[in-house]
Amino acid sequence: MHQKLLKSAHYIELGSYQYWPVLVPRGIRLYTYEQIPVSLKDNPYITDGYRAYLPSRLCIKSLFILSNETVNIWSHLLGFFLFFTLGIYDMTSVLPSASASREDFVICSICLFCFQVCMLCSVGYHLFSCHRSEKTCRRWMALDYAGISIGILGCYVSGVFYAFYCNNYWRQVYLITVLAMILAVFFAQIHPSYLTQQWQRLRPIIFCSVSGYGVIPTLHWVWLNGGVSAPIVQDFAPRVIVMYVIALLAFLFYISKVPERYFPGQLNYLGSSHQIWHVLAVVMLYWWHQSTVYVMQYRHSKPCPDYVSHL
């Protein structure tokens, strides 16, 4: 029996000269970088552990095997359950205890819903990227990109709402601007041309622009509240900075393909840049959720100052 199991096992390398047998269900096999279709060849430093040429049923079944996508899938699947659980907890405990208004419930619901959609789109892509139909793979890739935009939208909606809580005019201006910008990017992402080679360099630029736009309302918010010496600025601005630092760190891992660039073939299953990007994405969204709850409680505990209300 033991020999039969070993015959059906795929041996993976976890560190130098350490090989471990991994059982793979019938109909699924793991491929090397040279064996996979061109559409999957994104990172030459990940040399093994690829799923490919699978029908939908086996794509779903591959959720429970160890491949180079396992951490990517489960990190955001668990991230989805994290934000789903936080949603229930917020609606039943956190918001009622803070005497939250109906608007607070709506904003927090939108924020967490966007985070959950972001997580699920990522899970869907990494689960079905091995589909035998390249068209199906590309559709899921487009949804993955769109999911990132939706996650960014969740950050903007909650951030703008509470930053300009006392400035209804500017709150509406920035919310409409952000919504229009995200919708434009969303429709571009689901267009077939977005995933072509011609757009390869433009895609990260678009994401950086959409994310970096948040600096404009942030600086405006600091000015409206009386500068960096204002208590709310000193309380909340560091949280915004931490979020951007996490996002920048995640993006640097994503584009640099570090650390596997320096250890090709050694980080196929654990510790690759894309896995770090995924974990940092969950950390960033969780941090922003906690910051949103913090500033919401702050807004309910302290009234709007007169010099802000009339601007």
From Swiss-Prot:
GO MF term set: protein-membrane adaptor activity; ubiquitin-like ligase-substrate adaptor activity
Segments in the Lumenal topological domain: 92-104, 167-172, 225-235, 297-311
Protein localization: Golgi apparatus membrane
Pfam hit, one: HlyIII
Region of interest (Required for interaction with SREBF2), ranges: 1-20
Membrane-related topology note: Multi-pass membrane protein
GO biological process, one term: positive regulation of SREBP signaling pathway
Family: Belongs to the ADIPOR family.
Subunit structure: Interacts with SCAP and SREBF2; the interactions are direct, increase in low cholesterol conditions and tether SCAP:SREBP complex to the Golgi apparatus. Interaction with SCAP is mutually exclusive with INSIG1. In hepatocytes, interacts with PPARA and HUWE1; the interactions promote PPARA poylubiquitination and HUWE1-mediated degradation. In macrophages, interacts with PPARG and STUB1; the interactions promote PPARG poylubiquitination and STUB1-mediated degradation.
Entry protein name: Progestin and adipoQ receptor family member 3
UniProt organism field: Mus musculus (Mouse)
Taxon lineage: Eukaryota, Metazoa, Chordata, Craniata, Vertebrata
Name of the coding gene: Paqr3
